[in-house]
């Protein structure tokens, strides 16, 4: 896992996001409507991060130190705009989960929070299957409501936990994320 520093890396992340959005749309699954997510990954000010294996980008996200994302209580590491390469196993999500929990603990943050787009109730398929997989990985569902980008989301959190030995499985070269500003959170 590393911060995406170069224009080439950020462009690869934007392309991954577009591929994932197309994949979701073809399956009639929810896609973020309110924001140009690929543009966020092209912007070096967002400090996006990517999960690589053998030089191949498997996932990307925008990690932020968040004092309060508008739901939940207290500070957290917020994983914004998480996208994985289409048609990949859940192992990628599991690695992101382990990394994020460990990274948050190393930043002295108590929690990791993330959001998953939803269209219907949380017990309706296909979101219910995704949420079951995430809860099996340790995530807790904190209800649903408007997300950081204004779309309806399932709100997720997991406790930060140092995971000794994780560095043999996944390396971390992610810069400490900045604190999200009210403008970045959509608050003015």
Segments and roles (model prediction):
Residues 1-35, 171-181, 187-188:
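Short amphipathic alpha-helix that is part of the acyltransferase structural core
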Residues 25-53:
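Active-site rim helix/loop that mediates acceptor-substrate recognition in acyltransferases
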Residues 50, 56-67, 78:
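Conserved beta-strand in the GNAT
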Residues 71-86, 115-116:
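Conserved acetyl-CoA binding element of GNAT-fold acetyltransferases
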Residues 88-106:
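Conserved acetyl-CoA-binding loop-helix of GNAT-fold acetyltransferases
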Residues 104-124:
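Conserved GNAT acetyl-CoA-binding A-motif
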Residues 118-146:
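Conserved active-site alpha-helix within GNAT-family acetyltransferase domains
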Residues 142-188:
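C-terminal "cap" of GNAT-fold acetyltransferases
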């Amino acid at each position: 896992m590393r911060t995406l520093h170069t224009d080439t890396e950020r462009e690869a992340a934007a392309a991954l996001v577009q591929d994932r959005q197309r994949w979701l749309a073809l399956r009639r699954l929810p896609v973020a409507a309110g924001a140009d997510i690929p543009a966020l990954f092209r912007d070096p000010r967002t400090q996006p991060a990517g999960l690589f294996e053998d030089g191949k980008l498997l996932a990307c996200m925008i990690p932020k130190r968040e004092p309060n994302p508008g739901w939940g209580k207290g500070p957290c590491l917020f994983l914004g705009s998480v996208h994985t390469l289409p048609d990949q196993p859940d192992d990628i999500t599991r690695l992101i989960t382990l990394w994020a929990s460990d990274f948050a603990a190393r930043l002295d943050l108590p929690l990791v929070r993330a959001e998953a787009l939803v269209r219907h109730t949380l017990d309706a398929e296909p979101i219910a299957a995704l949420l079951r997989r995430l809860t099996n990985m340790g995530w807790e569902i904190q209800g649903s409501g408007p997300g950081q980008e204004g779309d309806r989301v399932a709100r997720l959190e997991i406790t930060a936990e140092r995971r000794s030995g994780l560095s043999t499985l996944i390396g971390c070269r992610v810069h400490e994320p900045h604190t999200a500003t009210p403008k970045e959170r959509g608050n003015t």
